[in-house]
Amino acid sequence: MFYPHHQSQQSTTTNPSKHHDSQDVRLPGTSSWSRHPSHPSFTPSLPMPSPSGYPPLGSGYPPGGHHHPNVNVHSGIHGPHPSFGSGMGGNGGMGHGQGFGMGMFQNGVQTSPPRGEPVPMTSHWQTQMMRAEASRSASSPHHRARAAAISSRATNKPAAVPIVDPNNRPSSSYGTNGLHRKNASSVFNGEPTGTPPLSDPSLTPAQNPAEPATPAPVAGQTESKDEEKPNEPWTGLDLGGIRLKRLSTALFSFTHVTSLYINHNALTSIPSAISSLRQLTLLDATGNELSTIPSEIGVLSKLKDLLLFDNNLTTLPFELGTLYQLDCLGIDGNPMNADYRKKLVEDGTRGLITYLRDHAPPPPPPPERQWIDLETDVDTPTSGKQESFSVLTYNILCASFAPATTYSYTPSWALDWDYRKRLLLEEIVTASADVVCLQEIDCKQYADYFYPMLKKEGYEGQHYPRSRAKTMSVDEQKLVDGCATFWKEEKFRLVETQVIEFNQLALQKTDMRTEDMFNRVMSRDNIAVVAALEFRASGGRLLVANSHIYWDHRYRDVKLVQIGMLMEELEKIVEQFSRYPVKLDTDPEYNNGKPPKYERSEKGRDIPLIMCVDLNSFSGSAVYDYLSSGSIPGDHEDFMSHLYGRYTASGLKHHLGLRSACAGIGEMRMTNFTPTFAAAIDYVFYTPRTMKVTSVLGDVDKAYLDKTVGFPNAHFPSDHIPVFTQFRIKGHLDPLPLNGDPYH
């Protein structure tokens, strides 16, 4: 997570037990916010990169030998590298025995250079040779553009037709479905296609034990909230066969390009700025004079064809290992490392890419995330000393939701659960938040690992699995994920815990038993866990809700119904909590020596409330607006014309007066980061009438993200990042407007 130890502006009278003032939770040998080395309580110790920068030998790491293998260079003299196949030969081909890239047929088409040893003609190598010969035959100037024009005339289409991937083929059998979650539907041009396998109303929760939690790309929005769909009329660019010696940087401003042909030129290098072309699916650099290719190509995660035939390449950057959708890596005609060539012959492109991915040294860690101060954390004379506390919410990516087929851009050792869980624990311990809310944590990992390890760090906790666990055997229940809430025992006392099961609530609402409620809502077994806490020192109360809302954007009506039911239950719980007897034996330093007092007329709305939620929705969505504004009309478009009784008849409304803790900074840039999705979907909501946000932890360094395909990776153990905030109780209740509505 890489965040520094936050130095609060708290006054000297502030509780000295506040997490960022304690010293005993720091990891030995590090500053208080560094990630490594491991905490001494970890068993076994978390293996970390050696001083050389490579992963050490041991369980969970790739085998030794992370340096580039020795290059097997063929004998022979390197002669000039031809870039054109036509107009250079007479009768008879050019000599095949001297150097690389010099063999040519009579028609001027380049052939593969000689090799010291014959290459076994496996199916993978046959494919390699077929693609190589196809690329070599396209050596004339603008070959693909001319072919596209001829094709358009033959089909009676306008002549000025763009190049639209003439080499486009069906999707790779190796690749994923284009989304970052298993079983999600594919998306083309922003429109979902196919039937969402996890959204079939006939499917019961028990039949979907690995339900994804992160939203699928939505219409017109396949990667992130801020990205716009390109509207250029062309997507291909053919600069082939024109003797280019260098590429202009202006080329890389065409970020919408999906196919780039720079084949059969005289290029000796490809600029690193090619990383700007994130939409590329095909890059053909055949027949140049390249001796290296930039590591930045590794961030072009949409690449399916990377054709580098007939160059002077002896090795490949490890960063190509993140090209998880690559179907064809063309290396024939290069004096390539013998081990790489052998791997390609035997295991194909996927085998070579996987080898590079798993043997790549860990990249440099990102800079620490920086704290952003919003308000001063000091006491006021009128309210006296008040409680300060910190909250961290984190979707930790359950092991059963992280198969290698879904996160194929992640090194196998970094995706391994033993590695990830230790890194997750280290993040939580290093943060030392007073309240920790985790989502996607299964029963086994909670009971066997996180609870006992966090117990040693002074935490107490509660965990509840999804509703489907009730219908499963004991062994099956262990793998069901849910929500866990932890709190510092020295700071809080647990009063009670309640679990809210959305599908059970739907069943109980007799006035809302519509067909849509049965088919769309009751089959989703998301939950919320509510912990009623009491500050040990001041006797003040704090209600903490921890929830995980359904993931699929195509079922955003379900999200609205779930969040509507959650708010109804929270209003009941806070009112019940307000009726509890007040603690009288409190620390006289707090609240000017007065015990806390809660008015019955407020119905619990004067009790500080925190809601940590993986909302699976953007700011500005219907569920976000409902939480932030207190109401949503019944005819809102996100109900999608479905019927949910009074919810769609009169709309949703609550009176808790919530606000996102990160609203003051315009929300996080992202809290979920994969190759196909990057946006903020995790939030901490609070009641601004009763407390204030003093600081929030900022975004991950943008320069680091620009060089990263997605999470998890060596430094980030989940596809989400934690949202970390610090609060201070006000000690008084801000007055309501005249109409009594906290939002107006």
Swiss-Prot record:
The keyword Ribonucleoprotein does not apply. Its cofactor is Mg(2+). Keywords: Cytoplasm, Exonuclease, Hydrolase, Leucine-rich repeat, Magnesium, Metal-binding, Nuclease, Nucleus, Repeat, RNA-binding, Transcription, Transcription regulation. Residues 1-100, 132-235 are annotated as: Disordered. It holds the Pfam family LRR_8. It is an enzyme of class 3 (hydrolase). GO terms for cellular component: CCR4-NOT core complex; nucleus; P-body. InterPro entries: CCR4/nocturin_mRNA_transcr, Endo/exonu/phosph_ase_sf, Endo/exonuclease/phosphatase, Leu-rich_rpt, Leu-rich_rpt_typical-subtyp, LRR_dom_sf. LRR repeats lie at residues 231-254, 255-277, 279-300, 301-326. This is CCR4-Not complex 3'-5'-exoribonuclease subunit Ccr4. It comes from Cryptococcus neoformans var. neoformans serotype D (strain B-3501A). The lineage of its organism: Eukaryota, Fungi, Dikarya, Basidiomycota, Agaricomycotina.
